[in-house]
Amino acid sequence: MAVFPLSAKHRKYALRALAVSIILVSAAYIALTERTERVRPQRVEQNLPPLSWGGSGVQTAYWVQEAVQPGDSLADVLARSGMARDEIARITEKYGGEADLRHLRADQSVHVLVGGDGGAREVQFFTDEDGERNLVALEKKGGIWRRSASEADMKVLPTLRSVVVKTSARGSLARAEVPVEIRESLSGIFAGRFSLDGLKEGDAVRLIYDSLYFHGQQVAAGDILAAEVVKGGTRHQAFYYRSDKEGGGGGNYYDEDGRVLQEKGGFNIEPLVYTRISSPFGYRMHPILHTWRLHTGIDYAAPQGTPVRASADGVITFKGRKGGYGNAVMIRHANGVETLYAHLSAFSQAQGNVRGGEVIGFVGSTGRSTGPHLHYEARINGQPVNPVSVALPTPELTQADKAAFAAQKQKADALLARLRGIPVTVSQSD
């Protein structure tokens, strides 16, 4: 069990006390060694009371982290963390039947916030159902445990990686602990120029991407901010840029001169005429479940019945009801890219081979939805990736955007320069 105090002030005092203790112990040791012949050693045994949250004298709130063991239930983990039995009973009686609280993996951790009075205030942990990571957050208010709608304490840090290809690019990136979603996004970003699988021994990949941390543990990867691939001595670069007018709708990738990086394998058609982007790709608070989860696509708000079009040529591989997606269509495209269109009110007559721009359905609110919109996903080899990197048209930069892009690129260039000449590196920068 690990305990993490929240107060920086208390940590400072603790470090000072530790330093003083080391000095005193060292002095005592020196004094004792001068009198070893006069002092007879004695063995003293004393039974200590069990660890308890109450009456510890700790006045500040702190997080307790408890690792899940094979076969553990949530009640087992909470009991081992020191939570009172009656509190555990209140949680399990109210939420014990919910799937996300029943299925715990042995490689995850449960975090409990302990208040200054020694009582539990919050419980947080991630679940992974069918590749979708969800944050389960419970909080106690007015003596009642309920699902928390407060923001999770997640920190985003840019992560730097420099990898020299040995046998294969994907294998070398995996050994350097580059997440699979980053590997597949990288493949999509440069798909119009070369295949990631075509890199040879001695080629290099340098990456800057966002990583999300929860209580000090990396839980997910965000967008690739900059990428540099040296293939056969030729350098290829991609830079992520989002203009102010795009708001929360996500950005796009451009080369070092601010030009559109690629044609994205024929993805030059928006899937619909939309009002606004209501939810981008990435972590968000789910409006119905009130849990933080990885939103694996982009939501486009649009009126009921708005035509939805295939974003590129492909083959319809699924058309029908698909759980929380409601009415959905899936299309397989070239280069291992697959797109999904969800919450449709109805389907068109399209089936089999479809052309880019062909109507495949109509906007609706079927499945788990709060109102009419299109949920649009892109996957590469089954792995969800940000659609802007592979499956949406990229707009040309305006003159105003070019100046902002140049300033942003300059910062990324400085970080990439640090990585050149380093075979494998891992670092974060605040």
Swiss-Prot record:
Residues reported to bind Zn(2+): H295, D299, H375
Annotated signal peptide: none
Cofactor(s) named in the record: Zn(2+)
GO molecular function: metal ion binding; metalloendopeptidase activity
Compartments, as annotated in UniProt: Cell outer membrane
Cofactor, free-text remark: Binds 1 zinc ion per subunit. Binds a divalent metal cation, probably Zn(2+) in vivo, Ni(2+) ion is found in the crystal structure.
A single cellular component GO annotation: cell outer membrane
Post-translational modification: Likely to be synthesized as a proenzyme. The cleavage of the N-terminal domain is probably required for the activation of the enzyme.
Assigned keywords, A-Z: Cell outer membrane, Cell wall biogenesis/degradation, Fimbrium biogenesis, Hydrolase, Membrane, Metal-binding, Metalloprotease, Protease, Zinc, Zymogen
InterPro entries noted in UniProt: Cell_wall_metabolism_enzyme, Dup_hybrid_motif, NMB0315-like_N, Peptidase_M23
Keyword Protease in annotation: yes
Any GO BP annotation: proteolysis
Function noted in UniProt: Has both endopeptidase and DD-carboxypeptidase activities. Degrades cell wall peptidoglycan (PG) to allow consummate expression of pili.
Complex formation: Monomer.
Name of the protein in its database record: DD-carboxypeptidase/endopeptidase Mpg
UniProt source species: Neisseria meningitidis serogroup B (strain ATCC 13091 / M2091)
